Curated annotation (Swiss-Prot):
The keyword Transit peptide applies. One of its GO terms (cellular component) is chloroplast. The keyword Transit peptide applies. Residues 1-54 form a transit peptide. This is Ribulose bisphosphate carboxylase small subunit 3B, chloroplastic. It is found in: Plastid, Chloroplast. Belongs to the RuBisCO small chain family. Heterohexadecamer of 8 large and 8 small subunits. RuBisCO catalyzes two reactions: the carboxylation of D-ribulose 1,5-bisphosphate, the primary event in carbon dioxide fixation, as well as the oxidative fragmentation of the pentose substrate. Both reactions occur simultaneously and in competition at the same active site. Although the small subunit is not catalytic it is essential for maximal activity. Keywords: Calvin cycle, Carbon dioxide fixation, Chloroplast, Photorespiration, Photosynthesis, Plastid, Transit peptide. GO terms for molecular function: protein domain specific binding; ribulose-bisphosphate carboxylase activity. There are four genes coding for RBS in Arabidopsis thaliana. The basic functional RuBisCO is composed of a large chain homodimer in a 'head-to-tail' conformation. In form I RuBisCO this homodimer is arranged in a barrel-like tetramer with the small subunits forming a tetrameric 'cap' on each end of the 'barrel'. One of its GO terms (biological process) is reductive pentose-phosphate cycle. It comes from Arabidopsis thaliana (Mouse-ear cress).
Length: 181
């Protein structure tokens, strides 16, 4: 018992603890930092990207159908679709092919609550492609879906089964009868 008391007393009086870093004493005064205030109330002077501020046009809300991710771009070619699917697979997301026969875009039919839209849920083509490692497999399923339903909109989604969320969704095919108007 005496030896255990002796060793604990030796630890408490150790000179190594006396040389530890000083405790935190607080932040330095902000008086050392210069404060500049602009008196100009012009809205263009508020935002800055390091150069001259220029305004961008907004997406026209009338006559343009909104689809999924990348809907503002021209239709994707087969090579571009393969690259998107490769990206999906690199992120370890599960690819899934879905189709919609009537509306390939969000619309309002049953609800008028802000933020509520119909047309978000599409019909799944077969099962999700669990274990898929090649974009050619996914594009083959898209082609099969096109043959079965030539008048359908087809999209590819990427599902993260760890977080249980849909991470990406993009249109893979629009029917020939569809017009953008």
């Amino acid at each position: 018992m005496a030896s255990s008391m002796l060793s604990s007393a030796a630890v408490v009086t150790s000179p190594a603890q006396a040389t530890m870093v000083a405790p935190f004493t607080g932040l330095k005064s902000s008086a050392a930092f210069p404060v500049t205030r602009k008196t100009n109330k012009d809205i263009t002077s508020i935002a800055s990207n390091g150069g001259r501020v220029s305004c961008m046009k907004v997406w026209p809300p009338i006559g343009k159908k909104k689809f999924e991710t990348l809907s503002y771009l021209p239709d994707l070619s087969d090579v571009e679709l393969a690259k998107e699917v490769d990206y999906l697979l690199r992120n370890k997301w599960i690819p899934c092919v879905e189709f919609e026969l009537e509306h390939g875009f969000v619309y309002r039919e049953h609800g008028n609550t802000p933020g509520y839209y119909d047309g978000r849920y599409w019909t799944m083509w077969k099962l999700p492609l669990f274990g898929c490692t090649d974009s050619a497999q996914v594009l083959k399923e898209v082609e099969e879906c096109k043959k079965e339903y030539p008048g359908a909109f087809i999209r590819i989604i990427g599902f993260d089964n760890t977080r249980q969320v849909q991470c990406i969704s993009f249109i893979a095919y629009k029917p020939p009868s569809f017009t953008e108007a």
